[in-house]
A protein has these predicted regions:
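Positively charged n-region of N-terminal signal peptides that target proteins for export
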Residues: 1-4
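N-terminal, active-site-proximal structural segment of metallo-dependent hydrolase catalytic domains
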Residues: 20-105, 115-125
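Active-site regions of metal-assisted phosphoester/phosphodiester hydrolases
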Residues: 21-51, 55, 132-194
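Bacterial N-terminal signal peptides
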Residues: 8-17
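Generic alpha-helix detector with strongest preference for long hydrophobic helices that associate
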Residues: 6-9, 50-54, 82-83, 111, ...
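Active-site-adjacent helix-turn-beta-strand microarchitecture at beta-sheet edges
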Residues: 97-159
Length: 194
């Protein structure tokens, strides 16, 4: 009985040591809420987010949104400036917007890299990753096309995937952003069944 108790105690200590030896890392998902640049892209339907469009989306509004995004992401890093190792985002127009985010003064020290693919979504809205290559060693990435058999002509955002290692351990990340409920829950349900 005494040997069993000692063995159980040692096993518990070993388990606790393994758990406490692991470094916690921050992984974040953030919906950028229609973060478009101000340039009209003839390949997508982004007219709403241009200086001439109904939202009058100009460089002043863009800079304000960029500053707000920088603040939110930096606040996640906290006082200790422990930047998230992976930030998955949705509702971003293109790589250029992501490059502006990681170049902001408060985010630049994180030395982020980008994993992004243009999706077939009509407005050009994508999902993407920003990651720290000093911690996450990227081995690969790929988009997964989202298809809805009952709506073959419906084009939506891809699912973005990336894989690699953290401290030699394999990790796989996915970020997805399903179609909205525009038109009501029942009317839009088939678009979210992918």
């Amino acid at each position: 009985m005494k040997k069993r108790l000692i063995f159980t105690g040692l096993l518990a200590l070993l388990f606790a040591a393994c758990c406490f030896a692991q470094k916690p890392y921050k992984v974040v998902f953030y919906n950028l809420e229609n973060f478009f640049d101000t340039i009209n892209d003839p390949e997508v339907n982004d007219d709403e987010f241009t200086p001439e469009g109904p939202k009058k989306w100009n460089s002043v509004k863009y800079a304000k949104k960029l500053g707000n995004t920088e603040k939110v992401l930096f606040d996640i890093a906290g006082i200790d400036k422990d930047y998230p190792i992976v930030i998955g985002v949705s509702e971003v127009e293109n790589r250029s917007v992501l490059e502006d985010i990681i170049a902001t003064p408060k985010m630049a020290p994180g030395n982020y890299r980008i994993s992004h693919y243009d999706s077939p979504e009509a407005r050009g809205v994508d999902v993407a990753f920003m990651y720290r290559p000093d911690v996450f060693k990227l081995e690969g990435s790929a988009p997964i096309r989202t298809q809805i058999p009952s709506l073959p002509n419906f084009k939506t955002r891809d699912i973005s995937t990336m894989w690699g290692t953290i401290d030699g351990e394999p990790f796989f990340f996915m970020v997805a952003h399903w179609p909205s409920r525009l038109g009501g829950k029942e009317a839009s349900a088939p678009k979210r069944l992918a």
